[in-house]
Amino acid sequence: MHSSKRVMTTKTHVEQPESSMRPQLPESIQGSLMDVGMRVRKSISTGYKSKQTTFPAYNPPLYNTVSENIALKNTAFSYEPNGTKRPFEQAIPNYNWANPPQDFEEPEWLKPFDVVMEGTNERL
């Protein structure tokens, strides 16, 4: 909660005649009431609106025509008609360099420990 309060410093109201039905309140109380009223007004979603609009909110449809839907399904990224789903292995072209043959020997320090120990007679 705020510890500072607003205090009206200037008189913006016109002096009312004595025959008014409203009781006279000190300026500090009038300022507090105005402050509370503005807080209530801010907390209501329509608090700052002075009049209602006559037009309701309108959200146009995402796609206007059937031809737009068909055009979006057939994008440049679909390799088969209608974007048929397929496994990853079929989606990648089969090039020779994709899986090169093993033409080198793997260094000892890259092999798993049990494979390294197969060639020795040592026991753990």
From Swiss-Prot:
Q: Where is this region: Disordered?
A: 1-32
The domain of life is Eukaryota
Q: InterPro entries recorded for this chain? A: RNR_inhibitor (IPR013900)
Please state where this protein is localized.
Cytoplasm; Nucleus
Tell me which GO cellular component terms the UniProt record holds: cytoplasm; cytosol; nucleus
Keyword Nucleus listed = yes
Molecular function terms in GO for this entry? protein-containing complex binding; protein-membrane adaptor activity; ribonucleoside-diphosphate reductase inhibitor activity
PTM characteristics:
Ubiquitinated by the DCX(DTL) complex, also named CRL4(CDT2) complex, leading to its degradation.
The UniProt entry's sequence similarity note says: Belongs to the DIF1/spd1 family.
State what protein this is by name.
S-phase delaying protein 1
The organism is Schizosaccharomyces pombe (strain 972 / ATCC 24843) (Fission yeast)
Gene responsible for this protein: spd1
